[in-house]
Regions:
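Extreme N-terminal basic, low-complexity initiation segments
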Residues: 2-4
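N-terminal catalytic or cofactor-binding beta/alpha core of small enzyme domains
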Residues: 11, 29-169, 182-191, 211-235
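Cysteine-centered motifs
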Residues: 20-21
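Conserved TIR/SEFIR loop-to-helix hotspot centered on a Trp-containing motif
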Residues: 172
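Hydrophobic, aromatic-enriched interface-forming segments
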Residues: 175-182
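An accessory alpha-helical subdomain
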Residues: 198-204
Length: 235
């Protein structure tokens, strides 16, 4: 992992070029650049890797002048949101983008909505298996992503990669963390934008499976994420 001071210095250098000014001018303005927290889940369901975090790790530390903060979170209903909360409190990001695996999907999909429901088809990594439970008793039935979903999809496609909008994040941990981060933003961080991106299986995962499944190389998944984030930063 790169030293954070080094990352910040590179960020200042890029911004100085972009805005035709001195690095010292940018350093004097601590709010001059955006912070984007990007999370990815650990492996679950018997898989040895999770393409979500593997792709997140490949993201540049700076995208369009924004600092990218990368974080692995557990595929656990209760613990995942607590770790994201800690990171939000510590880093004060402008944007939170959670990334998860949706095996069977053919490309990267940007989620539009999360629902107030946990209904696990398989146990999470802590053995928890909620059935028809509300995620937040006092929360609304659903939250819409506050990211520019269609612009994200369009920018990925503009770079020659497949991408689409999804209108269901499921009822597993992916939906849970998307809903709860949006709930956190609505209650405590009204200026923070948040949303979710699902990625397909990696080519590595499906190589030895008994039946053919849609997949993408990790590097292509990472590029798709990068282009999606570009659209968020440019908005």
């Amino acid at each position: 992992m790169m030293d954070m001071d080094y990352i910040k210095e590179k960020l200042y250098q890029q911004l100085a070029i972009d805005y035709c000014c001195q690095i010292s001018d940018i350093k004097d303005d601590k709010n001059h650049f955006m912070k984007v927290l990007v999370t990815g889940f650990d492996p679950f369901g018997g898989e040895s890797v999770n393409p979500a975090y593997e792709a997140v790790k490949l993201l540049p530390d700076i995208i369009e002048g924004a600092q990218i903060i990368k974080l692995e979170i557990p595929t656990v209903f209760k613990k995942s949101i607590e770790i994201v909360k800690e990171a939000v409190e510590k880093d004060k990001p402008d944007v939170v983008i959670n990334v998860g695996q949706a095996g069977g999907r053919a490309c990267v999909t940007v989620e539009k909505v999360a629902i107030n429901l946990a209904d696990a088809g398989i146990p999470d990594n802590a053995g928890d298996s909620p059935e028809d439970e509300s995620l937040e008793k006092d929360g609304p039935d659903a939250y819409f992503s506050t990211l520019p979903v269609k612009a994200m999809v369009e920018n990925v496609r503009a770079h020659g990669l497949p991408c689409s909008v999804s209108y269901s994040a499921g009822t597993y941990v992916c939906n849970s963390v998307m809903y709860r981060v949006l709930h956190l933003a609505a209650r405590s961080y009204p200026n923070m934008k948040a949303g979710f991106i699902h990625v397909p299986y990696s080519s590595e995962q499906v190589a030895n499976k008994d039946r053919p499944l849609a997949s993408m190389p990790i590097e292509i998944i990472a590029k798709s994420l990068e282009h999606a984030i570009e659209a968020v930063v440019k908005e």
